[in-house]
């Protein structure tokens, strides 16, 4: 009968198994996009994934949108405005933007692509056409840095398009809304001091530049103007190719021209291009251009080694299998050989350096072991604890190895086999005993097989071996009975029986021997035939 300790341990394991089963049913699996889930959880302000899942379930089951407190916009104008923003982004970047989360304003949503480009859209407000805001002029330095090539291609379109482009670039450089001012003439020169100050500000601003960020504000709007010619095609540098100068970069002028096109929508809001400090995604470095001043870009070339190193971030690590080497122990008198450096170091530490031994606590035993796990297995032999029970006959055992060997009795499995005679058994002890028998009788194997050379202890074993292993060769040989000749018996004198009958036995080359028994009163029939 099992002890109370074993029953308590069994009940504890059963309760643990049931608890794991219940937890596995209600466990939340978020899929393989773990980084995106963690980023969304942090942006929404949750500390646990379960809270994020509860929030998403509430959002799904709720009748209205939590983020949109105001009335929903018209289905046509609101969605068309979102399509316009997405189209504006697609002219600069080929990646598809996705919803990142709520923005800073009430009801504002932020969309972001994999390259870090963001733009905000507020569905609660429908843009309406308004007057054109007049803003501060763009400095000559900024013009040269951002729109030099685009302006050269658009000079034929007239002064009106150029003034609109310069006002939008001014908003980009200042990053804040500026008060309304009147635009000066196009060819007006500025003071040298102002140019130097603005050059310094531009270098500070562009040195920390990161991918484009689009944000929309429904306060301003754009007038209906003729569509300018398309902007030059953005060239994506290939691997090992030097990125082009900023003159060939996609210009904000072309983006703003597409916003104000009458075909898409009466541009209800202005799209403000800002330089955000969002870090670039290393895997999408080929989709973004580095924004640098002309002087610094000419002096410093992109570092290809840094791009290769950072491109490996986030990829799954592939572990290489350790090489199999034969490493013998270098201590004198020890011939152990290991295939792993870790095993060799462990062997040296406990067998030679420390020579730590674990003694059995039983006073009558006195055995010691080099490893603690071996001592634990040995201590079970002294106790009456039998935690391993056979499922066929309910017999209990102290160790799992004994249970495995016992279970083979019920299954009939005999995995161990003698390599000499093919004897099979269930446990290693039986095989060792059987091999010892072969070692003792090795000198007595005097009868070899004439076909394969295998030796046996008895001639009967040779005959049994030939009939089992070489049945096709036996018919060509003489039968075993002919190998031993029958003894010849010659009796020249006749044996007289007590009754007077004579018994004569003759043997010749003929295998059939004749034996005659004659009595005195009965004549021999063979003598009668001869006469």
Swiss-Prot record:
InterPro entries: Znf_C2H2_sf, Znf_C2H2_type, ZnFinger_BTB_dom_contain. The keyword Translocase does not apply. Residues 155-249, 287-307, 474-531 are annotated as: Disordered. It comes from the Eukaryota. A zinc finger (C2H2-type) spans 327-352, 358-382, 388-410, 416-438, 447-470. Keywords: DNA-binding, Metal-binding, Nucleus, Phosphoprotein, Repeat, Transcription, Transcription regulation, Zinc, Zinc-finger. It is found in: Nucleus. GO terms for molecular function: DNA-binding transcription repressor activity, RNA polymerase II-specific; RNA polymerase II cis-regulatory region sequence-specific DNA binding; zinc ion binding. Its main location: nucleus. Phosphorylation at Ser-469 results in loss of DNA-binding activity. Gene3D superfamilies: Classic Zinc Finger. The modification Phosphoserine is found at residues 231, 469. Pfam families: zf-C2H2 (PF00096). Residues 155-178 have a biased composition (Basic and acidic residues). GO terms for biological process: regulation of gluconeogenesis. Coiled coil: none annotated. SUPFAM superfamilies: beta-beta-alpha zinc fingers. Residues 502-520 have a biased composition (Low complexity). Residues 290-303, 483-499 have a biased composition (Polar residues). Residues 186-206 have a biased composition (Acidic residues). Belongs to the krueppel C2H2-type zinc-finger protein family. May act as an transcriptional repressor for PCK1 gene expression, in turn may participate in the hepatic gluconeogenesis regulation through the activated AMPK signaling pathway. This is Zinc finger protein 692.
């Amino acid at each position: 009968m099992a002890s109370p300790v074993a029953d308590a341990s069994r009940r504890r394991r059963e309760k643990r198994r049931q608890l794991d089963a219940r937890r596995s049913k209600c466990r939340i699996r978020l899929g393989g996009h773990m980084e995106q889930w963690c980023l969304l959880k942090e942006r929404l302000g949750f500390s646990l994934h379960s809270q994020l899942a509860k929030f998403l379930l509430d959002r799904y089951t709720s009748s209205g949108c939590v983020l949109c407190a105001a009335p929903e916009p018209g289905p046509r104008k609101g969605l068309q405005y979102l399509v316009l923003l997405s189209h504006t982004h697609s002219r600069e970047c080929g990646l598809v933007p996705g919803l990142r989360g709520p923005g800073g304003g009430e009801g504002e949503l932020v969309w972001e692509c994999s390259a870090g480009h963001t733009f905000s859209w507020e569905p609660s407000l429908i843009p309406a056409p308004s007057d054109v805001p007049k803003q501060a002029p763009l400095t000559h330095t900024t013009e040269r840095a951002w729109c030099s090539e685009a302006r050269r291609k658009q000079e034929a379109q007239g002064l009106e398009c150029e003034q609109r482009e310069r006002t939008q670039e001014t908003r980009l450089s200042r990053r804040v809304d500026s008060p309304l001012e009147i635009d000066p003439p196009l060819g007006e020169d500025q003071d040298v001091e102002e140019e130097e100050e603005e050059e310094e500000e531009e270098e500070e601003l562009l040195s920390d530049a990161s991918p484009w960020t689009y944000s929309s504000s429904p306060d301003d709007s754009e007038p209906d103007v003729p569509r300018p010619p398309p902007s030059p095609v953005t060239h994506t540098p290939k691997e090992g190719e030097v990125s082009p100068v900023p003159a060939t970069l996609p210009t904000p002028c072309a983006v703003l021209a597409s916003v104000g096109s009458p075909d898409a929508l009466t541009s209800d809001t202005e799209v403000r291009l800002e330089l955000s400090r969002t870090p670039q995604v290393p895997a999408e470095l080929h989709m973004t251009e580095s924004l640098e001043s002309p002087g610094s870009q000419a002096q410093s070339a992109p570092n290809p080694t840094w791009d290769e190193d950072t491109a490996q971030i986030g990829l799954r690590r592939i572990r290489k299998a350790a090489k199999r080497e034969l490493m013998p122990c270098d201590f004198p008198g020890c011939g152990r050989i290991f295939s792993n450096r870790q095993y060799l170091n462990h062997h040296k530490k406990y067998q030679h350096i420390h020579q730590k031994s674990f003694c059995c606590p039983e006073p009558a035993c006195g055995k010691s072991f080099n490893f603690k796990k071996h001592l634990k297995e040995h201590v079970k032999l002294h106790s009456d604890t039998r935690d391993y029970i056979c499922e066929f006959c309910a017999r209990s055992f102290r160790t799992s190895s004994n249970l495995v060997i016992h279970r083979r009795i019920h299954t009939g499995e005999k995995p161990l086999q003698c390599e000499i005679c093919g004897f099979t058994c269930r446990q290693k002890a039986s095989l060792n005993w059987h091999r010892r028998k072969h070692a003792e009788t090795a000198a007595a194997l005097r009868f070899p097989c004439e076909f394969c050379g295998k030796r046996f202890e008895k001639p009967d074993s040779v005959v049994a071996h030939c009939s089992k292993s070489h049945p096709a060769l036996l018919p060509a040989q003489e039968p075993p009975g002919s190998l031993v000749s029958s003894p010849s018996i010659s009796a020249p004198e006749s044996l007289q029986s007590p009754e007077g009958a004579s018994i004569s036995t003759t043997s010749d080359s003929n295998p059939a021997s004749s034996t005659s028994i004659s009595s005195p009163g009965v004549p021999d029939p063979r003598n009668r035939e001869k006469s």
